[in-house]
UniProtKB/Swiss-Prot annotation:
Location of the active site: 145, 284, 304
Class of this enzyme: hydrolase
Cleaved signal peptide residues: 1-21
Protein name per its UniProtKB record: Cysteine proteinase 3
Cellular component annotations (GO), alphabetically ordered: extracellular space; lysosome
One Pfam family from the record: Peptidase_C1
Gene: cprC
GO BP terms: immune response; positive regulation of apoptotic signaling pathway; proteolysis involved in protein catabolic process
Length: 337
């Protein structure tokens, strides 16, 4: 049973006695904010769900206030993930298995790349303006981010080569690339997906093979309806932002990042810089589609797969030339069409 607004108010009133003296806001401020947030995000809870979600919302409301009050150029807000604990968020939305590959060549060579010279001059490119990027998609509660990063880069290089931008099938990758090391909604790697597409001689379009937010037992690839092909792929030198930026001048690039922090979960605007980010423990696949500079702050334009209501209409500006913050150049790659 979903709760009515009246019953919600009753439950909130009953929870007053549990409010800690350490809370940042008054009971009424928490209450009003949560009700407004529920309405704007079309959220509805059962009786059992309500109080845990409300408690997590209050914690996130405090976190956002404390972060923003420090004057960071990264702005946080109460987005669609504001009723989730950080653990719940990581479990449901992150899924790049980068640690598998970092145990090999990339991790051993990471330290050799971080101190290479970086671009000093401002660089500006945005592949959205060149019709090489499809609209923001939504992976839902499935750790399929790697498949969206993969289709994004294949869509980009194909559009640049042919002049035609076609939305490609993430479901095709989810259902059919397990033999290449991917694990469906439990994560995978973009390079594994590239290997699958090469071996498979192509990928279906989103229209031909729609996304279902789950893995099917059967691969339903339509051999006679290939929408895009690639011949190979190139991996960026691990940790080398120079190499990543050179690649971005050519086409969009698939990147793996550390997105595990509350600051990423609740990102709303500004240039994202997280001092606690790891450059090796990577857990989310996204798509770098350009780069720019804002008031002296260099950034990458990064397309996420959490729908257009997250971040900057589905995008995030991530710090550029900041010692590979969040590992954005640790495991970057792009296909060759």
């Amino acid at each position: 049973m979903r709760l009515s607004i009246t019953l919600i108010f009753t439950l909130i009133v009953l929870s007053i006695s549990f409010i800690s003296a350490g809370n940042v806001f008054s009971h009424k401020q928490y209450q009003d904010s949560f009700i407004d947030w529920m309405r704007s995000n079309n959220k509805a809870y059962t009786h059992k769900e309500f109080m845990p979600r409300y408690e997590e919302f209050k914690k996130n409301m405090d976190y956002v206030h404390n972060w923003n009050s420090k004057g960071s150029k990264t702005v946080l807000g109460l987005n669609q993930h504001a009723d989730l604990s950080n653990e719940e968020y990581r479990l449901n939305y992150l899924g790049t298995r980068a640690h598998i590959k970092l145990n090999g060549y990339h991790k051993r060579n990471l330290g050799l790349r971080l101190n290479r010279p970086q671009f000093k001059q401002p660089l500006n490119v945005d592949w959205r303006e060149k019709d090489a990027v499809t609209p923001v998609k939504d992976q839902g509660q499935c750790g399929s981010c790697y498949s969206f990063s993969t289709t994004g880069s294949v869509e980009g290089v194909t559009a640049i080569k042919t002049g035609k931008l076609v939305s490609l099938s993430e479901q095709n990758i989810l259902d059919c690339s397990s033999s290449f090391g991917n694990e469906g909604c439990n994560g995978g790697l973009m390079t594994n997906a590239f290997e699958y597409i090469i071996k498979n001689n192509g990928l279906n379009s989103e229209e031909q093979y729609p996304y279902e937010m789950k893995v099917n037992d059967e691969c339903k690839f339509q051999e006679g309806s290939v929408a895009a092909k690639i011949t190979s792929y190139k991996e960026i030198e691990a940790g080398d932002e120079n190499d990543l930026q050179n690649a971005l001048l050519l086409n969009p690039v698939s990147v793996a990042i550390d997105a595990s922090h509350n600051s990423f979960q609740l990102y709303t605007a500004g240039v994202y810089y997280e001092p606690a980010c790891s450059s090796e423990d990577l857990d989310h696949g996204v798509l770098a589609v350009g780069m720019g500079t804002d008031n002296g702050e260099d950034y990458y334009i990064v397309k996420n797969s959490w729908g257009p209501s997250w971040g900057l209409n589905g995008y995030i500006h991530m710090a550029r030339n900041k010692d590979n913050n969040c590992g954005i150049s640790t495991m970057a790659s792009y296909p060759i069409a």
